[in-house]
Design a protein with these regions (language model features):
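...with weaker cross-activation on analogous glycine-rich loops/strands in unrelated enzymes
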Residues: 41-44, 79-142
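General "foldedness" signal
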Residues: 57, 61, 78, 84, ...
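N-terminal capping segments
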Residues: 6-82, 91-92, 168-176
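Aromatic- and glycine-rich peptidoglycan recognition patches
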Residues: 10-12, 94, 121-176
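Sec-dependent N-terminal signal peptides
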Residues: 1-5
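Aromatic side chains
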Residues: 69-72, 108-109, 154
Length: 176
């Protein structure tokens, strides 16, 4: 172990002492940048830009707005959503995936035949539970871990599936 690590208090060993640069990008600049990122990464980046925002701040209805937020994010990232206010409308949207994938849309079960929740997958925890950025979690856009047992489906927006396939084909062609 380096001498400076041994001499430091355990709580100080991993402290970042580098100066932090303030972010000066506006949300419109960030949205423009996210729209230029190919595939599902653009959807995730756009969702992340709105963390901490309320429905009112975004301009969405204040009740049951997770699907509204998902459609909003898809539009801002250059895609097209379901245009429905129902979270479960995303069950019939895009290409179904066999598991969580960064940038995929996760649809969750909630009590009631037509109830649900929807958001963008950011990753998974150590037990395979999806970490999702969604609207109307605690009345804001928030990142949270959801139980994998509540997942109804993971889907990828249709145009992003094609973009990712094309990107994979280009990458394979460059290797040859």
């Amino acid at each position: 172990m380096p001498a400076h690590a041994i001499a430091a208090k355990p709580s100080d060993r991993f402290v970042n002492t580098e100066p932090v640069e303030p972010m000066t990008r506006s949300r419109s600049d960030a949205a423009e940048a996210a729209a230029q990122v190919p595939g599902a990464a653009g959807v995730l980046l756009e969702a992340l830009r709105w963390r901490g925002s309320t429905a009112r701040q975004i301009g969405l209805p204040a009740k049951l707005w997770c699907a509204d937020f998902m459609n909003f994010v898809l539009r801002r990232a250059g895609g097209k959503g379901t245009q429905s206010r129902a979270a479960r409308s995303f069950l019939d949207y895009g290409k179904k995936l066999d598991g969580p994938r960064v940038g995929a849309i996760a649809i969750f079960y909630r009590k009631g035949l037509n109830s649900g929740h929807v958001g963008v997958v950011r990753g998974t925890d150590g037990q395979g539970n999806p970490i999702v950025v969604s609207g109307n979690h605690g009345h804001t856009v928030m990142q949270a871990t959801y139980p994998k047992s509540k997942v109804l489906a993971y889907v990828m927006p249709p145009n992003y599936v094609l973009e990712e396939m094309a990107a994979a084909a280009r990458a394979a062609a460059l290797k040859n």
